[in-house]
Amino acid sequence: MTLYNPEILILSALEEETNNEIFLDKNSKTIKTLYTGVGKINATIATLKAYPLFPELKTIINFGTAGSNNIPIGKLIGCTKFVQRDMDARPLGWELGKTPYDKTPKILSFKSNIPNDENIVCGTGDSFCSNIEYDLVDMEAYAIAKVCWIYGINFISYKYISDGGDANEWKINISNGVNKFKKIISQI
């Protein structure tokens, strides 16, 4: 009998975001958690390394912190749309967020399990920013979403709003979202 759910994997950038908690699904099976490190490249590498290790994998869940100017600190959000906010080839005639010569859509769309979060856009980039143009911003979700989109894996992303672009707020709130996330995961 499998003591963990082989069809679901949680990816989080840092152990501090999860407090090293063990997450259980609705059948009380452990959902494995892997840590990607910060940023798009680290997230991509970790996702690609994890994929062959879990042959029954159907869903990747990303949990982490995010900044927002319009969603209050302390709220857990299910993101549904992902854009690469720092891809800027506009001088070459490309739209902001669109990778030149890449057939992947500019905005990757997935379903959310949280009601009323169907149009939340997460802007992912390798920089901390205070001028937030999207519903929220992070540093990993788009990278993980793109790997999932390419390989046909379901992708769910939950972001805990830790700050409004202020690094000091982030440091204070980095671990505060784990209990809200744990409640959601226990229903999957």
Label for each model-derived stretch:
Residues 1-2, 130:
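A short acidic-Thr-Gly-centered motif at the start of a beta-strand
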Residues 2-9, 31:
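Extreme N-terminal starter segment of soluble prokaryotic enzymes
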Residues 12-17:
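Short polar catalytic/cofactor-binding loops
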Residues 19-188:
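Glycine-rich phosphate- or other oxyanion-binding loops that anchor nucleotides, phosphorylated ligands
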